[in-house]
Amino acid sequence: MLYIAQTTISLAAVFGIFQLFRIRNRAAFLITLFQIISIAISILTGPPVEKYGFYLFDTLILVATIYIISQSIMLRLKIQLLLISVPVFLSMSFKLFQWPYSYEWSILMIIPVLTYITVLFQRKEMKHELGIVTIITTEAAIELLSVFANWFNS
């Protein structure tokens, strides 16, 4: 499961690299760039350093949430983007800080995945956020698949 997760998030990072060439907003560009860097740190380094990649990725999800709130986009799209970023941020925070109920937050990753499917139909309205949201949703899908894998293995 680990190699599947690493491959999947790496593909999302490659998609983010392609999105970097289309982004004209500096904040969205930097968020996407640092998400790609945090994924590289998490995958390419060993146990003492990879933890910092996860912390950076979680912090960038919070920054992306603030960025989404501050953007002047349609309210419906803003709510959908927040439905993607906020649960993933909370789930990763619960896991990283080893708080209780982190497994329950992983079950709620169905919300970002389903919301992302609806957002894809409105991708013309999202000029700069598609790379950010794709990487965040990929993380949510990996968490959701790990929950399903645990259910089927037990």
Positions of the model-derived regions?
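Membrane-interfacial loop-to-transmembrane alpha-helix junctions, especially the N-terminal start
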Residues: F21-F34, I73-I84, E104-W105, M126-I136
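Juxtamembrane boundary at the C-terminal end of a transmembrane helix
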Residues: L144-S154
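Hydrophobic transmembrane alpha-helical segments in integral membrane proteins
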Residues: M1-A12, V49, G53-F54, N150-W151
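Membrane-interface helix caps and helix-loop-helix hairpins in membrane proteins
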Residues: L44-K51, S93-S102, F152-N153
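Hydrophobic alpha-helical membrane segments
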Residues: L83-L90, E104-F121, T138
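Alpha-helical transmembrane segments and their membrane-interface exit regions
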Residues: F15-G16, I37-S38, T59-I69, M109-L120
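Alpha-helical transmembrane-segment detector that highlights a single hydrophobic TM helix
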Residues: P47-R76
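Hydrophobic alpha-helical transmembrane segments of multi-pass membrane proteins
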Residues: Q6, L30-T45
